[in-house]
Amino acid sequence: MSLATLETRLDHRFGNAALLEQALTHRSHSARHNERLEFLGDSVLNFVVAAMLFERFPKLDEGDLSRLRANLVKQASLADIGQRLELSQYLRLGEGELKSGGFRRPSILADAVEAIFGAAFLDGGFDTARKVIVRQYQPVLASVDPKTLGKDAKTLLQEFLQGRKLALPLYTVVATHGAAHSQQFEVECAIPALEIKVVAPGASRRAAEQSAAKLALEAAQAASPARAVRKQGKARKAAQLSLPVAVAQEVK
């Protein structure tokens, strides 16, 4: 498959296309794989993301900046970038990895993303690698909230519900798919008090729970204003109903 579309998404045309091919090559495919490029890309990525955070959040201290960076460069965040780049269709995997669904495995996607950053550094130097990384991370940073740094979706949902004195969510595995070594899980997250039930998939039970919690949190945040309006309406109605009784008591 042509790499031209991927290069457009990266906003970099490789002078040495072999570097990009190597970045997409898993060790199960050939001896010239991407692990050394991944090592290099990891170092460049950490520096560039640290600089981006330093500029964007001038009031955050070192501890908060470190936690935020760790959250942005972790495997799940890199795998999300890999999915957005549609790397699955470009990965070069051995037969065993192909059969086991390695092209969608978060660890393989994340490693390939870091390897691409390393390849960009070797192909065009630091400025090129920085441009490639910034392009991928700008939309991520635009939605970053320092108040939630380092907290996963389940923790955020729990804090949201506890802050409103609501019962904690219930997580249930509703389905599993695939062979034992490459199972996909579907988990339901239910919040009875808000009449919310959502289902999300994941490569592990934990990943599916996190995805379901994220959907449930979004639904709960959307439902909260409407719930508050309903409560105000009920309180107003109760006050109106009690008014004639109060008047009657005064007349007596």
Curated annotation (Swiss-Prot):
Ranges where the DRBM domain occurs: 152-222
Transmembrane domains' residue ranges: none
Binding-site list for Mg(2+): E38, D111, E114
Domain of life: Bacteria
Disulfide bonds: none
Entry-linked Pfam families: dsrm (PF00035), Ribonucleas_3_3 (PF14622)
Catalytic site: D42, E114
Cofactor names: Mg(2+)
Domain RNase III positions: 3-125
Enzyme class, UniProt record, top EC level: hydrolase
GO cellular component: cytoplasm
Location of the protein in the cell: Cytoplasm
Family: Belongs to the ribonuclease III family.
Biological role stated in the UniProt entry: Digests double-stranded RNA. Involved in the processing of primary rRNA transcript to yield the immediate precursors to the large and small rRNAs (23S and 16S). Processes some mRNAs, and tRNAs when they are encoded in the rRNA operon. Processes pre-crRNA and tracrRNA of type II CRISPR loci if present in the organism.
Subunit: Homodimer.
Protein name: Ribonuclease 3
